[in-house]
């Protein structure tokens, strides 16, 4: 059986920009992407902690060290600059792969700097 499991999470990032006139997507600082192994053009699910919106888009790599989290195109209507978001990817794994799978989680501070990396296992609580 194949199951869809969380693969990576950027936890509590702050939206730094919103660009309605760009052709869709989310731009994320390349350093953050590398830390959690998210690739450009990869599909992501986004949860806005401020308003409860949940949506999907794809990733564009942003400038390294910028802390940039910019929602582009239609998705920009679902956020405000300063909103706290969770950005996740999923992977389809078989039962054997699941036994050895540990999602990468980057916990962010208010400036979108990684303050903790968690290789998530069962029952991990991230506040």
Curated annotation (Swiss-Prot):
GO terms for biological process: alanine biosynthetic process; pantothenate biosynthetic process. Pathway: Cofactor biosynthesis; (R)-pantothenate biosynthesis; beta-alanine from L-aspartate: step 1/1. It is an enzyme of class 4 (lyase). Is synthesized initially as an inactive proenzyme, which is activated by self-cleavage at a specific serine bond to produce a beta-subunit with a hydroxyl group at its C-terminus and an alpha-subunit with a pyruvoyl group at its N-terminus. GO terms for molecular function: aspartate 1-decarboxylase activity. Its cofactor is pyruvate. Keywords: Autocatalytic cleavage, Cytoplasm, Decarboxylase, Lyase, Pantothenate biosynthesis, Pyruvate, Schiff base, Zymogen. InterPro entries: Asp_de-COase-like_dom_sf, Asp_decarbox. Substrate binds at residues 57, 73-75. CDD domains: Asp_decarbox (cd06919). Binds 1 pyruvoyl group covalently per subunit. It holds the Pfam family Asp_decarbox. Heterooctamer of four alpha and four beta subunits. HAMAP family: PanD (MF_00446). Catalyzes the pyruvoyl-dependent decarboxylation of aspartate to produce beta-alanine. This is Aspartate 1-decarboxylase. The lineage of its organism: Bacteria, Bacillati, Bacillota, Bacilli, Bacillales.
